[in-house]
Amino acid sequence: MIKSELVQIIASRNPHLFQRDVENIVGAVFDEITNALAEGNRVELRGFGAFSVKNRPARSGRNPRTGETVDVEEKWVPFFKTGKELRDRLNGAV
């Protein structure tokens, strides 16, 4: 599912909302999650999961095409840990 499909599903299940309003709401939610992560904060959605950022330290890598050793810089990457309710639902427990 892509963002536009998510918007369409939410709009169809909530006929009292205009699709453009749903687009704005979904966009605002994603923007706030992104902003919080960019500030180094954790975003927890109870029952669904938690978004956080993890540090990947600098390391030596290898160019697969040439075999040349390259230095890979330190970077921060997004991380998502599923919540118990989501895991249970995916595994048929609910």
Swiss-Prot record:
Q: Which PROSITE patterns match?
A: HISTONE_LIKE
Q: Does the keyword NADP apply?
A: no
This protein's UniProt keywords: DNA recombination, DNA-binding, Transcription, Transcription regulation, Translation regulation
Q: Name one GO molecular function term.
A: DNA binding
Q: What Pfam families does the annotation carry?
A: Bac_DNA_binding (PF00216)
Its cellular-component GO annotations read: chromosome; cytosol
Subunit composition and interactions: Heterodimer of an alpha and a beta chain.
Q: Which family does it belong to?
A: Belongs to the bacterial histone-like protein family.
The record's section on NCBIfam families has: hip, PRK00199.1
Give the protein's recorded name: Integration host factor subunit beta
